[in-house]
Amino acid sequence: ACSERGIAVLTLFAFSSENWRRPRPEVEVLMHLFLTTLRREIRRLDVANVRLRFIGERGAFAATLQEDINKAEQRTAGNTGLTLVIAANYGGRWDIAQACQRVAEDVAADRLQPGDITADLLDQYACLADLPEPDLFIRTGGEQRISNFLLWQLAYAELWFTDVLWPDFDGTTLDQALA
């Protein structure tokens, strides 16, 4: 539906860094769902010319999931259609912190001077540095908050909230959000 509407990049919040606080059995179900969905959908996404990217801290995931994530990115790296970004074990605060850590490393290594640090420079260290900032944030399920998602990148995005649950979100609902 996104490609048909001229949308070049879609970022989905699949697993928040805060989700680790859920009960262990629930986290295990989510991890199993994540892995099985990735394995089931990767061929279809590749055939559809979708480029798959993942953002977030991968180190907390099981080795098999990390391997499948890497394989999916490699398999679709040359695709030129929709870029589908999956935020997994991601949090906006984490993204800002990791960007600041990387800037600090470059300052310590004399690759940057403290006076070089600007908002534009920090953009270059964020997870989505090579992609355009989001134009639109859609939150489903009746919640009216951004829940630590793309905090830096959503600064100028339109925010659209709907009571429609994610599994029921369809092209008609997308058209309403885009209107």
Can you name each region flagged by the protein language model?
Residues 1-179:
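Flexible, compositionally biased loop and terminal segments
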